[in-house]
Amino acid sequence: MHGLIADFIHYLDVERGLARTTQVSYQQDLTTFMAWLSDQKQTTFPEDFGVIQAFLKHQNDTKAPASVSRMISALRKFYRFLLREGAIKSDPMTKIDTPKKAQHLPATLSGTEIDALMAKPDTTKPLGLRDRAIFELMYATGLRVSEVVGLRLDQLHLAMNLLQVTGKGDKERLVPISPQAADWVNRYLQESRPRLIKHQQPKAVFVNFHGHALTRQVIWKNLKAYIASVGIEKDVTPHTLRHSFATRLLENGADLRVVQELLGHSDISTTQIYTHLSNQHLVAVYHKTHPRG
């Protein structure tokens, strides 16, 4: 069973060209599936619809709808692969419907909360200056955390206030960066990064104390710690900075298509969730400013 999963991941990489982050997510989902099958004394990947249904019911009881949807997507592709390779005779996933994602409004940070967060890292220390540069960059550009950790030195064009970003599906886009955020990144590059990389020559812009490329998990953990230390009680993740970036743009009159391009969304319907947030802002402004509001 391990071998089939490894073959599938290799297929996703070589033949489908899926992004590494997607490959890792699918591998984790299939490993979870295999562990559950082992608990059920199953030694092969089942073709029985009922077994798949029981597994997904277990997942629904313990995981968020978005995670279950991704799990179904992984299983659907995996079973197609197994059928193609002759490892199974029938595909039970054809009977499984993908649940509709519940659309929820993402959390955002106010201007005051952003200021409090930015002021928290100790910029007299290498790691503090690095963290400030990361937060300034994320809020100024709306980059995904995976795009931040994947950012290379040769993708920085700070003199032109531009970044060359590799997004989902390895699609590249140019993203503008504010002069303020560019200044913080420059400070990090000049003052902190040389002290962190020591004698190494990593291509990654952002590195850890040992000079290795930073991970998404470290940024997530550090952000959580800073948020807690300034007393913000919202459930804040790196994606919250991306949400806040998009919401501020729309509140200040940016065109939805422009925001779509900046965020790297392939489908504008993904971007449209932010219009609900900006509409809330419009209603609040109306009630505050209109004489009969």
From Swiss-Prot:
Its main location: cytoplasm. Keywords: Cell cycle, Cell division, Chromosome partition, Cytoplasm, DNA integration, DNA recombination, DNA-binding. Residues 104-287 form the Tyr recombinase domain. The active site is at R144, K168, H239, R242, H265, Y274. It is found in: Cytoplasm. GO terms for biological process: cell division; chromosome segregation; DNA transposition. Belongs to the 'phage' integrase family. XerD subfamily. This is Tyrosine recombinase XerD. It comes from Lacticaseibacillus casei (Lactobacillus casei).
